[in-house]
């Protein structure tokens, strides 16, 4: 289960049981990259599991494949979280719920503001989930406006990002599968229509108002 951008999010099963993202499957992986909701000061990540056998195998893989020092049972990597990053994350962890709540408040303000225009489709949160808004990403109804909006906002001093502009099936690394443009039309359509606006725990009202004002101004021309 990939929870690189979803740490702290909830998922509610049909029986009413609610669990955290990353604990639904046999194992869940998350990222502690500095920009994440729970970020370290350098690279880092974690895998969560209740399976003792799997946990032992994972600990071995991330430590050069060693079952004990100098004895390599498998091919592994050096993926050990250093003590500095662990100490930072231990302190920040107690603030995670507050971080996520702050992001949700920023997202709700965006959603309310952009509901006033027909040009934007805001993020949807299903009733059985919660959203932690690692990114605030909207869809434009008119894909031809996306790059124009990105350039316009930059000219006004408003950062916006087009994340993951090339879908996996069109990446050179996966070209051996033989997929071509048009094979995954919905994916390609979404890649052409999404754009992300600033969101973080320390965002001030004046900053967000300025962003909203300029986004809406673009669509008023």
Where are these regions (language model features)?
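Conserved PLP phosphate-binding loop immediately N-terminal to the Schiff-base lysine helix
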Residues: 1-31
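Residue-level micro-sites within transmembrane alpha helices that shape
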Residues: 1, 25, 35-36, 42, ...
């Amino acid at each position: 289960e990939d929870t690189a951008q979803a740490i702290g999010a909830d998922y509610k099963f049909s029986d009413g049981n609610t669990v955290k993202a990353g604990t639904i499957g046999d194992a869940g992986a998350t990222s502690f990259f500095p920009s994440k909701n729970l970020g370290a000061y350098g690279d880092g990540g974690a895998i969560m599991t209740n399976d003792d056998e799997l946990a032992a195998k994972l600990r071995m893989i991330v430590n050069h494949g060693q079952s004990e020092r100098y004895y390599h049972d498998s091919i592994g990597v050096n993926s050990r979280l250093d003590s500095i990053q662990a100490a930072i994350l231990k302190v920040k962890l107690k603030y995670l719920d507050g971080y996520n709540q702050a992001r949700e408040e920023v997202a709700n303000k965006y959603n309310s503001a952009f509901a006033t225009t027909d040009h934007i489709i805001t993020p949807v949160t299903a009733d059985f989930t919660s959203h932690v808004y690692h990114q605030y990403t909207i869809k434009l109804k008119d894909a031809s406006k996306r790059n124009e909006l990105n350039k316009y906002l930059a000219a006004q001093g408003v950062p916006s990002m087009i994340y993951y502009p090339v879908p996996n099936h069109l990446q050179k690394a996966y070209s051996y599968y033989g997929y071509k443009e048009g094979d995954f039309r919905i994916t390609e359509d979404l890649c052409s229509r999404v754009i992300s606006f600033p969101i973080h725990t320390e965002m001030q009202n004046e900053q967000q108002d300025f962003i909203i004002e300029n986004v809406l101004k673009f669509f008023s021309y």
